[in-house]
């Protein structure tokens, strides 16, 4: 395994990929626009530059044997050129191109008979109004930007005609709101030989205002039949894309028992961070196994787990201080992971905390305790 590997993106996902690569002494190069990116201190070689500029991505890719990503917002044209020239790019550029545009992603689900919420493609704000005029029963709905939405940004709830000014005046999709009971996720990995391996289904709880994961539980508290369906849909989705690497499949469990795909991510994902401690193979090691065409690892969980996102506290912008970290480290079965970001700002992802316990109900009770024990502030 002496082939050089490049990661497009040097944030926390890249950092955890790097940490997983150390045991195998993989030579990792990283491209990121931020001179203070979390990956900088760990990688073999760091290049500061744009992820969306063709020439920058192309030149970076010429210096490595294998390319992968930690974020979808990259220049796919450059990756396609590198792939044609013989570089190994995983996930494949064709997969990234579909997934980085929510319009193409949703159309892909429809074209491949993968269950998803009803939707209409829109070109601008006027198109949203016209779609609702033709089908008023579509409300309530969400208007989503086709490109560049991330961690809840690029999504607006449209509950009535009075909300139309909130719709984006850009290409997007209008999606009928799902009356869901739970939000689930399954991470699936696939290597070049077509071997597939899924991680246990998790149950995500989203922050009510920020539209990003507040905390999750693994495994999800769902019936065996719902779990079977969720796992099957994740596998079918990975097979439909033909992806090489890790794919996170976010799902809705509706109140009528139906399972619908919300969206997918072609990379390690927030819904799998707990696997670093809680599973035999982490999602990050599994990604390396997949793109290096190695046998996929055992995804069995050691214990039930919870994962809490550690966000910058509202009203605090500046050098980060982790108040309560010592108290947190004294708690049994609690494992904090800090991302090495020097500066905090409101709701910025600064780290995560994994909790493990033999009893899932005990974990549920401890989440609030852990959340109250630590905060990321400025002094």
Which residue stretches match the model-derived regions?
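A conserved helix-loop-beta module that forms one wall/lid of the active-site cleft
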Residues: 91-155, 161
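Internal nucleotide-binding/catalytic subdomain
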Residues: 154-249, 253-256
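Active-site "cap" helix and flanking loop/linker of ATP-utilizing ligase/carboxylase catalytic domains
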Residues: 228-249, 255, 265-317
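Short, flexible active-site loops
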Residues: 210-220, 263-276
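Peripheral (often C-terminal) accessory segments that flank ATP-dependent C-N-forming ligase machineries
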Residues: 26, 289-379
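ATP-binding N-terminal substructure of ATP-dependent carboxylate-amine bond-forming enzymes
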Residues: 1-100, 104, 126
